[in-house]
């Protein structure tokens, strides 16, 4: 039974994901009505600092002080968002009772295969929770009423939404190349020489190439849910001098006989009832600036008749649909709110 006032805590509140969750919660109709209350804000390195010092774009919370992330501080909350580094969520989640809805933005509970987890994260697998892409077949129902939710990674979100209809409808051979250009906020706030302005401004750089990126098994897992074929993915992330946004371009061999008209109809039919996925008109390409600050994913599907390939492009805001917005969308489903509550569909272009 949902309490009359839902008390929400955000662990990792001073990070980019935590800050985005707070921004969206402050605009949630349940917060405006008093049905939802923002409780403890916790972190590690910023304990004792105020929101005004760390996140002046959230003036409603200006006087709130960041606390330590402990079981005692998080006790008494109905919902706990975890925006912690990978590997820390399981420890905290295990200290919270089953009556608490825990929504984890880290990778700890995304992968179902323990070997994949060990290979890419180098620690013991903590298990898997309902996975937070409601647009995937069957996942919306799994998320309704869930008390444990794994928020997807930002790269798998953009790439999964780009490829899911093509793989499910057998438009392509699932030997797929994915290139995702991302803003630097995806790496978090921790100081790092490769993320300095002088290193990133005016420059593009691929990283964790040739199957090394941790999001590769997550994307593969997602696409395997909708096909019996073997799925092979070559994933290349590219760091761009942008604060936020991911532009994904995916290509794969076309199944003989598939036309542009057929491919486009598959995408339009697949996403016709999805509030946060927009298949753009023919000839209009997704741009990151058009989705910044929104929970939208813009998609374009094209058939390259010369190369005999399908080309799918998607754009998301890595902090909204890629993290914080996805977390709030999952909260809405878990608690029985309108799925779209508090989640903007309009971007802030240019």
UniProtKB/Swiss-Prot annotation:
GO terms for cellular component: cytoplasm. InterPro entries: AGPR_AS, AGPR_type-1, NAD(P)-bd_dom_sf, NAGSA_dehydrogenase, Semialdehyde_DH_NAD-bd. Keywords: Amino-acid biosynthesis, Arginine biosynthesis, Cytoplasm, NADP, Oxidoreductase. One of its GO terms (biological process) is L-arginine biosynthetic process. It catalyses: N-acetyl-L-glutamate 5-semialdehyde + phosphate + NADP(+) = N-acetyl-L-glutamyl 5-phosphate + NADPH + H(+). The keyword Amino-acid biosynthesis applies. It is found in: Cytoplasm. Its main location: cytoplasm. Its EC number is 1.2.1.38. It comes from the Bacteria. Pathway: Amino-acid biosynthesis; L-arginine biosynthesis; N(2)-acetyl-L-ornithine from L-glutamate: step 3/4. One of its GO terms (molecular function) is NADP+ binding. The active site is at 154. Belongs to the NAGSA dehydrogenase family. Type 1 subfamily. Catalyzes the NADPH-dependent reduction of N-acetyl-5-glutamyl phosphate to yield N-acetyl-L-glutamate 5-semialdehyde. NCBIfam families: argC. PANTHER family: N-ACETYL-GAMMA-GLUTAMYL-PHOSPHATE REDUCTASE, CHLOROPLASTIC-RELATED, N-ACETYL-GAMMA-GLUTAMYL-PHOSPHATE REDUCTASE, CHLOROPLASTIC-RELATED-RELATED. HAMAP family: ArgC_type1. This is N-acetyl-gamma-glutamyl-phosphate reductase. The gene is argC.
